[in-house]
Every structure is written in C-alpha cells, then in structure tokens.
Amino acid sequence: QVTLYNYLKTRMGTKWVLHFDDEIFLTSINKAKWNIYAVALQDLIFYSLSYLKVFHNYQETDKANGIYEEILDKETKNGMPKEIILLAKEKFTERLKKIDWNIYYKSWPFNESALTLYEWAPIAEELKSLDRKIVLNSMILKWDNIKDEFAKLIKI
C-alpha cells in the first residue's frame, strides 16, 4: 500500500491530496489497494514457506492454502470486498498448483505483486507505460527489505 500511495503521490505532484475528495478516484484506489494486497500476501506466503522448507526443513507447505484463506476471510472486517477475496483465492489456488517449494524463494518471488501494483495503480496508461521499470524496481526493492527482515527474525 505504501508503494501504491508513493507512486500516486509522485505522479500527481503537490496537489495529490486534493484528489482524495473525488469518490470515483477513492474507489479506484481502494480497489487497487485490495488487489495488490491479495497478491502481495500470496507472494509473502509462498516466499516464507519456500524459504523455511529449504533452510529450516519446514514440511507443512500443504497448509499454505489454509493460511491464505484464513487471513483473507478476516479481511472482510477491514472492508476487503468479497468479490476480490473470491478471485484472489482462485488465483492463489492456481499459483499453488504450479509452485516448486524448493526454488520459489530465489526465483523472482515477488514479481507477481510488483506486476499487480503496475496493473492496478489508477494512473493513466500513457503515463504508466513510462513508469513500468521504475514501479517494478521500486516494489522489488521494498520486498528486498522484507526478505532481509524475515531472515533476521527466523534466526532469533
């Protein structure tokens, strides 16, 4: 979400807060936020379980779907739209069928969420196309920080 808001702020300039009075724009941001969150959560679960399997002999990767669904089901309390939850669960199931737990953690594990940020950001397509590389790299760099924190936390 932070990356989405920073991207919007950068693209809109100093008057970006004025757009928060626009209900249509707010609806777009909210939809983008939840779609990005859903895929980022998928990436994080896949990364975490893959990393734990490889480096800590974690054998319960079959719990991935249950973990994801439990988190999303709780997000309805925070306003996550049910239709986004249903689509996200379907996408998770499809991705889960293809995952190789032994290599996921090292094979562009957060690429899907970076692409989702790019896809859902409510920015004009002609401007977005100019920003593609910057947006994707920005998201990947943010995830690098998370990966470092995760590695430190599990060593404690």
Residue map of PLM features:
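Eukaryote-specific, cytoplasm-facing alpha-helical/coiled-coil scaffolding segments in long proteins
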Residues: 27-32, 65-79
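Residues within HEAT/ARM-like alpha-solenoid scaffolds
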Residues: 35-39, 66, 80-83, 87
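N-terminal interaction modules that seed assembly of large macromolecular complexes
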Residues: 10-58
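Alpha-helical repeat scaffolds in large eukaryotic proteins
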Residues: 5, 9, 45-53, 69-76, ...
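Short, solvent-exposed secondary-structure capping/transition elements
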Residues: 49-64, 80-84
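Alpha-helical rod/repeat scaffolding segments in eukaryotic adaptors/tethers
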Residues: 26-30, 61, 129-132, 136
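Helix-driven interaction modules
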Residues: 73-156
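Amphipathic alpha-helical segments in structured regions that serve as interaction surfaces
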Residues: 1-24, 67, 116-119
